[in-house]
Amino acid sequence: MKFAETRIANRLVKDIGRIYDKAKRNPINFTDRETATIGGTQTDNVLFLEDFRDLIPHINVIKGLIEGEIGTELAWQWVHFVEYDKGGHQELHNHQDCEEISFILYLNDCKGGMTAFTYADKVTHWKEVPPKRGRMVFFSSGINHYALPALSKKKIMVGGLKRPEL
């Protein structure tokens, strides 16, 4: 499994966004540690936050879609929300030490803020994904990627999964 893209039902994206917008009012849900997010905010792992309990059935739908696509049962490792301000971006990184499969679900349309996937040289892009509400990409966690600066507010839900036996 290298890279795949799919669309998530508008109702599901709306429900996820509504849960996030309600929970983001509580500062306890946000991390105070350093992250790769620059010019924005990132939640702690929502799998363990009370304000996000209603999110679990929705993210399990997403897990089921990914499992169906790759033909393997998966277990959650983490899920975060990231909200970028204008100019916010993400440094080049991968998740190979945390999980097998990573995903990004775009919760809104925005200008700029493309996610770029790079070859091993970490410079040449082999794929650029513009933020579009309901678009979801999932990919092998060792793939290097980063987010270009957003020109308007950008909201995403990101997560990681791996096979239960690993």
Predicted regions mapped to residue ranges:
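Non-heme Fe(II)/2-oxoglutarate
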Residues: 1-72
